[in-house]
Amino acid sequence: RMLLTVPKPLLGMTGKVYLNSFRRKAKKHMERQKNGLHPFDWEIQYQDINKNSFEINITKCGFITFAKKFGAEGMLPGICNVDYMISYYMGNGFKRTTTLGYGDSCCDCHYELVGKCPIRPTGDLK
């Protein structure tokens, strides 16, 4: 609901700022993870595509580690699907064909500063 209270033009601008910040942090995280990770951190591979898009493959997820430790694995599908909802409302493009939270070997995330995505996963994802 909180996202819905923000005016739509502001959401689009916020989405671009958020993803550009996320992009910079992902590049830094690639270097930082070489020195080891916190037990609840993410292990990623980042790739710049162009000014509008980038990809992150997540091979270790902090949410999954945390959920397993505290017996809360049932929350994972909902947590995993939040990426779609946020991108949908902020006017960003997002797609993912594999998801760790559904038992796949990685989350293959494709982000676009300007793009479209469904509010929830489609196709074979649960």
Show the residue positions of the predicted features.
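Short amphipathic alpha-helical patches
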Residues: 22, 90, 110-114
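Short, hydrophobic/π-rich interface segment
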Residues: 42-102
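Amphipathic interaction/junction segments at domain boundaries or subunit interfaces
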Residues: 1-69
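Solvent-exposed, non-transmembrane amphipathic alpha-helical segments
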Residues: 15-19, 76, 83, 107, ...
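Activation/maturation switch segments at domain boundaries
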Residues: 97-106, 110-126
